[in-house]
Every structure is written in structure tokens, then in C-alpha cells.
Amino acid sequence: MLKPLGDRVVIEVLEAEEKTASGIVLPDSAKEKPQSGKIVAVGSGRVLDNGTKEPLEVAEGDTVIFAKYSGTEVTYEGTDYLILRESDILAISK
């Protein structure tokens, strides 16, 4: 499994909607870039100026909403992930 460093997290991105609410099937070119996913791994935290480590507010298993064009897309063992900083996460979905 991937282990992110510092204040980074690894997210398994949730798939974009295939249909609109009215049932119209969307072609790939019309789909919005997904902005939510499930956290599968978290880093050890951000190092502050005084040298102490601040733990992350998110945890493995959290479903989050993140900025649209943030992070780096990677494929690991056939699965697509997104690695991004905690500051790119906008909200936790409960």
C-alpha cells in the first residue's frame, strides 16, 4: 500500500455520475471531474516551524470533498488514486 509523507493523503476517487437526475446518459467528454473520494492512507502530519508535528484532521476511511484540480493522479497495482495535501481537502462528508 502507498504511505504518504507529511501532510499528504491518498484518496481513492469516487466515480463521476454516468447519468443526470433526469436520466440522460453523459458522454465521457461531458462528465465533471470527480471531487470526492475515500481516504485510504494518511501521512504522519505537518511539521510546524517549532519542530513539532501537527496530526492531520482526517483519518483513513473518511469520505472527503476536495478541490477540483488538486493533487497528483497515480496508478498503483491497477487502482487509480489521488495524492494531495490536507489543505486541498474542503470538507469531510459524514
From Swiss-Prot:
Its main location: cytoplasm. One of its GO terms (biological process) is chaperone cofactor-dependent protein refolding. The keyword Cytoplasm applies. One of its GO terms (molecular function) is protein folding chaperone. One of its GO terms (cellular component) is cytoplasm. It comes from the Bacteria. It is found in: Cytoplasm. Keywords: Chaperone, Cytoplasm. Together with the chaperonin GroEL, plays an essential role in assisting protein folding. The GroEL-GroES system forms a nano-cage that allows encapsulation of the non-native substrate proteins and provides a physical environment optimized to promote and accelerate protein folding. GroES binds to the apical surface of the GroEL ring, thereby capping the opening of the GroEL channel. Belongs to the GroES chaperonin family. Heptamer of 7 subunits arranged in a ring. Interacts with the chaperonin GroEL. This is Co-chaperonin GroES. The gene is groES.
